[in-house]
């Protein structure tokens, strides 16, 4: 999809840039959100083991650069898209975003982060959009409600 967007000058603006906080926490580290966000668990828990390989590498590069995991994850993402959508609920979240803008990962570091990645199946709302739906004029996810 990234190649198509680049060729057609379409901006990619991914949401959940830190995978519900998973890319900002070391394996085993938790937070209130990680413990209580049922929707994020639905999206990410099935792939936790394979994702931890990437999370460990994000932590390793954060240590090497003397910065946060948030900064490393967002710095990588900014090499792939035009505008990641990030949220901040605490002041230190903004610091990580600022650090990401200043951090430049080498091509080798970017490849190191990407190497263990395995594509995930779509879940949640995105999984409702099927290939068959692509033929219709509009695709809506409205539950039982008519639009």
Model-predicted regions and their roles:
Residues 1-33, 68:
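Aromatic-lined glycan-binding groove of carbohydrate-active enzymes
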Residues 7, 35-64, 79, 95-147:
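Terminal-tail/helix-coil boundary detector
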Residues 23-25, 81, 96:
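Short Asp/Glu-rich motifs
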Residues 27-28, 50, 86:
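A generic short alpha-helical patch detector that favors 3-5-residue windows
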Residues 72:
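Glycine/threonine-rich phosphate-binding loop and adjacent beta-strand/alpha-helix elements that clamp
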Residues 75-76:
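Hydrophobic, secondary-structure "cap" segments at the distal end of domains
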Residues 83-93:
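Glycine-rich phosphate-binding active-site loops on the catalytic face of alpha/beta enzymes
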């Amino acid at each position: 999809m990234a190649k198509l967007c680049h060729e057609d000058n379409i901006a990619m603006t991914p949401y959940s840039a830190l995978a519900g906080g998973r890319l900002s926490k070391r394996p085993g580290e938790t937070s209130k959100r990680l413990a209580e966000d049922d929707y994020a668990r639905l999206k990410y828990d099935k792939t936790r083991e394979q994702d931890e390989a990437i999370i460990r590498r994000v932590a390793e590069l954060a240590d090497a650069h003397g910065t946060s995991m948030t900064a490393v994850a967002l710095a990588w993402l900014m090499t792939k898209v035009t505008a990641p959508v990030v949220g901040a609920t605490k002041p230190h979240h903004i610091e990580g975003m600022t650090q990401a803008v200043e951090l430049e990962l080498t091509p080798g570091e970017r490849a190191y982060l990407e190497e263990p990645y395995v594509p995930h199946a779509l879940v949640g709302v995105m999984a409702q959009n099927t290939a068959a739906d692509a033929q219709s004029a509009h695709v809506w996810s409205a539950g039982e409600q008519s639009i």
